[in-house]
């Protein structure tokens, strides 16, 4: 009984935790349990803000929650494998690449302001995403093989039509080969990761509570 009280008390505190924003009360609550860990509504809100910042839009809450469950799986496997955190210089390079996706430094700052993320939040979340993607890359890239036929097909169906749409001269196949190969490798990594995540998730105890007692 004492052990049960010790376990339940922290959960009770989490369930009734309240943050005040302006005149509104936002109740932070448990929205999922994965094995012995929990995911909070505030975790959904934070990842959604990062999506808004990095991509210009965020997914619905249920999709964000599923991403958080997937991230739990990847992070747990990476930790078990003692996979190293990204180096500071790798985080800086990733941040520089992200900044280049914006038309100007002003647009970057404006989007960050709209998302409500602080500089520290942004770097922390970027580092977390980089850690997960690095692990998936290391896990699946060695087994992926891309043949010449796949490269030529991608060139004919994706590269050439896209250039023509923009009224540009398409690059030669040879000059685009490395870019195409990496694009196909990334697509294959995503496919293998999706398959692995579905298989891994089926073996875990996952409970979703997002739509229960919603405000």
Regions found by a protein language model. Give the residues of each.
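Bacterial N-terminal signal peptides that target proteins for export
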Residues: 1-9
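Peptidyl-prolyl cis-trans isomerase
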Residues: 26-27, 33, 58-215
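Bacterial N-terminal signal peptides
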Residues: 8-17
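Boundary at the C-terminal end of the N-terminal hydrophobic targeting segment
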Residues: 20-25
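N-terminal targeting signals for Sec/Tat export/insertion, comprising classic cleavable signal peptides
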Residues: 30-60
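Residues in and immediately flanking transmembrane alpha helices
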Residues: 16-19, 48, 56, 194-195, ...
């Amino acid at each position: 009984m004492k052990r049960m009280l010790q376990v339940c008390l922290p959960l009770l505190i989490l369930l009734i935790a309240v943050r005040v924003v302006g005149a509104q009360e936002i109740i932070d609550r448990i929205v999922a349990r994965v094995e012995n860990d929990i995911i909070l509504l505030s975790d959904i809100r934070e990842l959604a803000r990062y999506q808004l910042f990095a991509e210009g839009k965020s997914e619905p809450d249920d999709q964000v929650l599923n991403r958080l469950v997937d991230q739990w799986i990847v992070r747990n496997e990476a930790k078990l494998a003692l996979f190293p955190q990204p180096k500071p210089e790798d985080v800086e390079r990733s941040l520089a690449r992200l900044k280049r996706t914006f038309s100007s430094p002003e647009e970057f700052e404006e989007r960050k302001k709209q998302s409500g993320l602080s500089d520290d939040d942004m770097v922390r979340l970027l580092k977390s995403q980089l850690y997960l993607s690095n692990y998936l890359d290391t896990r699946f890239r060695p087994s992926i093989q891309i043949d010449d036929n796949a490269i030529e097909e991608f060139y004919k169906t994706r590269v050439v039509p896209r250039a023509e749409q923009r009224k540009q001269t398409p690059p030669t196949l040879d000059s685009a080969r490395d870019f195409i190969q990496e694009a196909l490798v990334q697509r294959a990594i995503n496919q293998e990761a999706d398959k692995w995540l579905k298989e891994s998730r089926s073996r875990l105890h996952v409970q979703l509570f997002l739509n229960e007692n919603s405000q």
